[in-house]
Amino acid sequence: MEIFDSLIKEVSELMEPYSKTEYSFEKENSWEDVGHNQVILQKETKIELDGVGFNLLTSSNIDDSIVVVGKDLQELKENSKFARICFIEFCEAEDIQKTYNLIRKIEYTKYHFFPDGYMIRTSSKAHKESVRVSKTAVKNGVDFHKIGNLLISKFKENPAVKGVKVVFVTEAAVDFSKLENLSRKNHEITETLNQVMNNLTFDCDTCNLKAICDEVEGMRELHFKSSRVK
């Protein structure tokens, strides 16, 4: 599947000018998952991160890794803008319906991810992801490497997931508005997949999906395939 590849390229290019720290995936060095939602009160909070979080799926090769662009959790002294982007290699299903269902299932992984002292709040409608990190977690050595290890482990519980690169961004110089736009576009592409499965319009000029098909490589081919147009 190539429909998200242009977004992966844009994110990578946006991060290119900034210094990065890259870690290999070490499952045994994962932060503890407490298995349930936590409430971290303001008085218990050391750092608040506010920004976006989204996943970009591809059939291209992705090596398991964690990349930190900017300061890590142990280095942050004040609240920060934030982004969490995952590049995910997966084996797409044999038809569009099953592939869409698989994408949604992979997306739902974030609702089963509960790092100790790391409270995640998401808004799918607003494409937002914010985090509260507790004083205790910081004291106990939490960092993005350990959080990323846990997240990759969660994704790879799904046998269709073959590789995951997690990118955490706190660098203040990054254009977070562009990341927000890419997150929004990612959501639009995913929702368009759902529409494609139910849209049997054969005329590109009158189809309400034309704008997305024109912009996203591979989307028109999926639409025609779904419509059984040769």
Question: PLM features: residue spans?
Answer:
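N-terminal accessory interaction module
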Residues: 55-140
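Charged, amphipathic alpha-helical stretches
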Residues: 1-64
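Long, charge-rich boundary regions
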Residues: 227-230
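A broadly conserved sequence feature marking short terminus-proximal activation segments
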Residues: 132-195, 205
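Cysteine-cluster motifs in flexible loop/terminal segments that predominantly coordinate metals
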Residues: 182-225
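Signals and flexible motifs at protein termini associated with secretion
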Residues: 1, 6-19, 24-26, 119-146
